[in-house]
Amino acid sequence: MIPKELFQKVRRIEITTSRLVSDVFAGEYHSVFKGQGVEFDEVREYQPGDDVRTIDWNVTARTGKPHIKKFIEERELTVMILVDVSLSCRFASVNMLKSQLAAEIAAILAFSAIRNNDKVGLIMFTDRIEKFIPPRKGLRHVLHVIREVLYFEPEGHSTDIMNALEYLNKVTTRKSIVFLISDFFPSGTILRPEKNGQNYREGLNSSEEILKKSLAIANKRHDVIAITLNDPREMQLSDSGIITLEDAETGKTILIDSSDAALRRQYHQNNTERLKQRERLFRSVGTDYIDISTDVPYTNAIVKFFAKRRRRKR
């Protein structure tokens, strides 16, 4: 029996996101993500303007009238949604938690997919694979996916995207559309406000190289789109005096003086470098990405992504 609170929350997301799919994303998903080919539909009489290359000469000869072969897009796709459920995603300084944001984005993608008769699957991960839901169709299946993303309690705390991508390649037998939703925080690098940022950059370089290989392999097999979850407090420290910061994934804490202007400046520089390296990583392996922040409506970023992909395919 589903708890009343859970049912209401799933229902709210269903109403909100399905409305967005109808009003904002109608046609966008279909035009951007095409099927794997075409399949024969029917033979009909030739009409002015038809491509002469599609004429079926056997039927034309038999009937004495020109006929053409009509083909339709082989529409069915498999959409895999990979969601980072590590503890760093249970954070926000404004609006909603990154985990809540992930659930709503997953819902929009899932509803868009089933509206186009595509299959939807889910992989939730931390430093291990927490749950795998095989791809299926239908509203009931999508509601199950949303319910899991919203209320699943992970066993792991930290993040291992490489392991999630390797698991994806094991359980998928055909080319899929893959949405990888994560804050892309390498474990152990969340707390780095030190004035000397050299160790921080070295840690990022090491994590990037580990992830780069797995992401490149996955992107060759699938169409991978990274969706990054961000929060403004991860970029700027406020002047609040002596404060304690805790890394949600490792549990480590650090006591800092946030009134130190040099430290706040270094904190901002470190995180600016983190975002730049993340962008370089995606570009180096040809992975599209969408930056989502807790303080800005996510619909704008997703609409811009669809428009960019559509222009590129022309």
Predicted segments — roles?
Residues 1-32, 38, 42, 170-174, ...:
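Von Willebrand factor type A / integrin I
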Residues 105, 163-167, 274:
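Well-ordered alpha-helical segments embedded in enzymatic catalytic cores
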Residues 1-136, 177-182, 187-188, 235, ...:
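An amphipathic, basic-hydrophobic helix/alpha-beta surface used to engage anionic
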Residues 66-68, 164-167, 211-213:
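A generic local structural motif
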Residues 103, 157-161, 207-208, 271:
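A conditional alpha-helix N-cap/helix-loop micro-motif detector
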Residues 141-176, 188-190, 205, 231-232:
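Von Willebrand factor
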Residues 89, 93, 149-153, 286-289:
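Short amphipathic alpha-helical interaction patches enriched in hydrophobic/aromatic residues
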Residues 133-147, 307:
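Short, electropositive alpha-helical surface patch
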